[in-house]
Amino acid sequence: MGRTVRQKRKNRSSRPKVKQTNRPKKALNPLGNDLIAKNWNKKETLTQNYRRLGLLTRLQAPTGGVEPGLRGAADDKSNAHAPLGLSERKSTASSAVREVRVKRDAEGRIVSVINEEASAAANPLDDPLNELETDSDWEGFGSDDEAPTGDRVVDQLERMARVPRVKTVRGLSEREVEWLESLVAKHGDNVKAMERDHRLNPMQQTAADISRRLRRLRGE
């Protein structure tokens, strides 16, 4: 049945709806240190940025899972030793029997081997890895090039921490000087009386605190 005339309409709630912000998706903006802010990558998480800069996100032991690396460094390090199986193929190809052109002297002894691969450069598939002569030339896909950046940032942070800082002495404000002078004009050097004066000491400052402020006023 439909709504009748006597049915009461539901009153709208006057309380606004609470909107939950998605904090993990909020971009981090480090403002504490200029050096870290300069080397910060907004496309990476906090853990990834700190790991790249050589810093720790927490001083305690990890309690949960470990965040994956930037580009799968664990798998790439294993591939760095045998990338795409090139080392196995290269060793197999080097051990295979093949024909070469040699240069002999008048007595028939081999003087030198004519290298035709350098001139021919057989690369029918245009493989960019064909130019790598040895396995030592391969640097892998890992993030080893990021280590110098982290070391450089850590060294600069350590140098900044070793710079001696001048200790700034807190001064007294004009209103604070007027308040202390009014206490001294009424009670002299009696700090206990200043502490019990509810009219001039409405914030109930202790005797030790008033004495410390008076020494700062006198430059002691």
Swiss-Prot record:
Signal sequence extent: none
Composition bias type Basic residues, residue spans: 1-26
Primary location: nucleus
Residue numbers spanned by region Disordered: 1-33, 62-82, 199-220
GO CC annotations on file: nucleolus; preribosome, large subunit precursor
Keyword Metal-binding part of the UniProt annotation: no
An example Gene Ontology biological process: rRNA processing
UniProt keyword list: Nucleus, Ribonucleoprotein, Ribosome biogenesis, rRNA processing
Location relative to the cell: Nucleus, Nucleolus
InterPro entries attached to this UniProt entry: Ribosome_biogenesis_Nop16 (IPR019002)
PANTHER family found in the cross-reference section: HSPC111 PROTEIN-RELATED, NUCLEOLAR PROTEIN 16
Self-association state and partner proteins as the record states: Component of the pre-66S ribosomal particle.
Role of this protein: Involved in the biogenesis of the 60S ribosomal subunit.
UniProt family annotation: Belongs to the NOP16 family.
Protein name: Nucleolar protein 16
Organism of this sequence: Pyricularia oryzae (strain 70-15 / ATCC MYA-4617 / FGSC 8958) (Rice blast fungus)
